[in-house]
Every structure is written in C-alpha cells, then in structure tokens.
Curated annotation (Swiss-Prot):
Top-level lineage group: Eukaryota
Gene3D superfamilies hit by this protein: 2.60.40.2970, Collagenase (Catalytic Domain)
Role this protein plays: Metalloprotease that shows high activities on basic nuclear substrates such as histone and protamine.
Catalytic center residues: E304
InterPro entries assigned: Fungal_M35_metalloproteases, MetalloPept_cat_dom_sf, Peptidase_M35
Catalytic activity: Preferential cleavage of bonds with hydrophobic residues in P1'. Also 3-Asn-|-Gln-4 and 8-Gly-|-Ser-9 bonds in insulin B chain
Protein name stated in the entry: Neutral protease 2
Keywords for the protein's UniProt record, in alphabetical order: Cleavage on pair of basic residues, Disulfide bond, Hydrolase, Metal-binding, Metalloprotease, Protease, Signal, Zinc, Zymogen
C-alpha cells in the first residue's frame, strides 16, 4: 500500500454499527422491482412492504446520485466487475439530505445505467439482482436495518450501445489542490494502519484455530474451509496495512475525487484499489473502540481493505452494516461482507 506523503497516495472507509428492529409481522421490509428501460438503462421501484413509515439512509442504495453499487450483474455464474465507489457512513449525526422516508405501501423510483459502472461492451445476456440491508434512521441516528431484495432481471445487452455509455470513473479527476498525508492526518492514519494490522492478525489466528462459537456468531458456520478463507483474507489485510511504500492499494488521507459528503467517513474505488478518507474519519472516530461493535479508525481501515480486490480476491461487498445486520446474513453473504470482518476483529480484540 502506498501512503500519501508529498508524492504518494492513501485511502480508507468506516464501519457502521446498527441494532435490529423487533422481529414480527410488522417488521419493515423493502421490495425492489427492477425493469429494463432501454438496453442497459434500468428502473428500480422500491416499495415499503411494512405497515408503518420508515426512514432510511439512501447512500449506497437506490436514489444515491453517486456511482455506487445498486445491483449485481452476472454473466452466467460469474459476476461482472463493478467499477464505481463504495461509501462508508457514520452511524449518528446523519443529515436530512441522506435520508428517505416511505409510508406503508409508498414507493420511490430510481433510474440508472448499469453500463456506467460495469464493462458491458461485449454484449449478450446478463442477469441483474440486488439484496442486503439498508440502515433505519431515527433523529439522525442509525437504530436498525431494513432487509431488501429484488427480482432477477435478465437483459440482452447491445454491446455497441453499451460501449458508448460514459463511464462514471472515467470522469473522475483529482482536484488540482490536494492535501497530501502530513501532519495530524498522517499521524492518525499511521496509527490506524498499525492498529488495523494488529487486529487483523489477531482475528486471523482466531478464525483459523480459535473459538468455533465466536467464529460462527459472525460468519454463520464453523466449516473449516470458510475459517481458512476468512483467516487468509485477514492476513492479507494485515500485510497490506503494514506496508506504506508498496503493496496493492493507494490510500488517500483526503478526498481527491470529491465524494466525501457530510455523512461519509470514507470511500473505496475497488476497480482502482484506492481508498480515501473523509474529514469525519478523523474528527468523529477514535483510534480504537472501547465498546463492542463500535466504529473506530482501525476497523474502518480494515473494513475498507477487504473491499479492495488487490488485497484479496474477490473484494467484499456491503451487504449488512453493523452487528445486527451482519449477523442476519447467510454464511455465504457473511463471507463476502466487509463489516463481518471488521466486527469480528473488534470482537476478538475486546473479547466481546
């Protein structure tokens, strides 16, 4: 990993803790209906299927105007590479512009072009779907989560037309004035990297040969192959965090691309293996959490390293934020969920 000094770059993202809503027939849920508009342009209609109004964060979800991952695209069994950004959110102090409210039975609509964040120039049939959890917000604080799931949509892509769609990241250029890693930001990040390496190594050892029930709590299985995979990814994170002059990622101390909105702690560009910290990464997160499953700089950095395929392939997704959402995932989804690794590392460190 290359860290921003006067000539190098540096980047990271943060972990969001949530608590689950009460289970039952009135539990909130979102139904997502995907339809094709024209070639690679898709419409999503998100419906509140619960009996009460819900307010949720729409960043990293439908209605987010940024090039975020709203759907997964598959050719056969293989997922098409996502070429956008993954943003990490703070868990409190969330401002109104990041929140959407839907009454019972109400819907929101979002249109987007899947070719803007994936290479579909080869054309042919692809299948599109989306699932996960979106954070519930009450008085600016994440207090729970809402599960969402879409239909499977099959689209026969015209490759020629898809190739002409402007790529979201091709428009990204670094700002002329970039604050390199120096001063307090450099000091904070250096500490975060050291702590992330320590936590990742501890968690890797625990994953491979530690308490089975603790591993199952976060990854929903005690299968030895899964334990080995988790340990390998965590060791790869530790190795990357321990390198500030080489490695596979570029880590920005600041926001070179302009995606640090008021509620974003950091963001990742997986296709470029870049991570960027936002101002509130430094101002709102402690170096290490003193409470189980709380946000901090170290596990935020660890979380973001798992997103980068250059660290360990494939990079993880954001399928469930925080302990309660992450521990509701299936074993397969937990293995591919960034926060599952961050939460597990925190739990091993604090003996949760």
């Amino acid at each position: 990993m290359r860290v921003t000094t006067l000539s190098t770059a540096l980047f990271a993202l943060a972990s969001t803790a949530v608590s689950a809503p009460t289970a039952g027939s009135s539990s909130p849920g979102l139904e997502v209906k995907l339809t094709q508009i024209d070639n690679t342009r898709v419409k999503a209609v998100v419906k509140n299927t619960g009996s009460e109004e819900v307010s949720f964060v729409h960043l990293n979800f439908f209605k987010d105007a940024g090039p975020v991952k709203k759907v997964s695209i598959y050719r056969g069994q293989d997922e098409v590479q996502f070429e956008g950004i993954k943003r990490r959110l703070r868990s409190s102090g969330i401002t109104k512009e990041a929140v959407t409210s839907l009454g019972a039975g109400e819907t929101l609509e979002d249109e987007f072009d899947i070719a803007s964040t994936s290479d579909l120039a080869s054309g042919g049939p692809v299948s599109i779907r989306s699932h996960g959890f979106v954070p519930i917000v009450v008085d600016g604080k994440i207090t729970g989560y809402i599960p969402y799931k879409s239909n499977d949509l099959t689209v026969n892509v015209d490759g020629g037309k898809a190739a002409k769609v402007t790529k979201a990241l091709s428009q990204l250029t670094r700002r002329t004035e970039v604050t390199d890693c120096k001063g307090d930001a450099e000091s904070s990040l250096t500490t975060a990297l050291s702590n992330a390496a320590k936590l990742a190594n501890q968690a890797a050892e625990a994953a491979e040969s530690g308490d089975e029930s603790k591993f199952e709590e976060y990854f929903k299985t005690t299968d030895q192959q899964t334990r080995t995979t988790v340990a390998e990814r965590l060791r790869a994170v530790a190795k990357e965090a321990g390198s500030t002059s080489g490695g596979s990622t570029t880590y920005h101390c600041n926001d070179p691309y302009g995606y640090c909105e008021p509620n974003v702690l950091a963001y990742t560009l997986p296709s470029k293996n870049e991570i960027a910290n936002c101002d509130i990464y430094y101002s709102e997160l402690p170096p290490l959490a003193q409470k189980c499953h709380a946000q901090d700089q170290a596990t935020t950095t660890l979380h973001e390293f798992t997103h980068a395929p250059g660290v360990y392939q494939p990079g993880t997704e954001d399928l469930g934020y925080g302990y309660d959402a992450a521990t509701q995932l299936s074993a397969q989804d937990a293995l591919n969920n960034a926060d599952s690794y961050a939460l597990y590392a925190n739990a091993i460190e604090l003996k949760c």
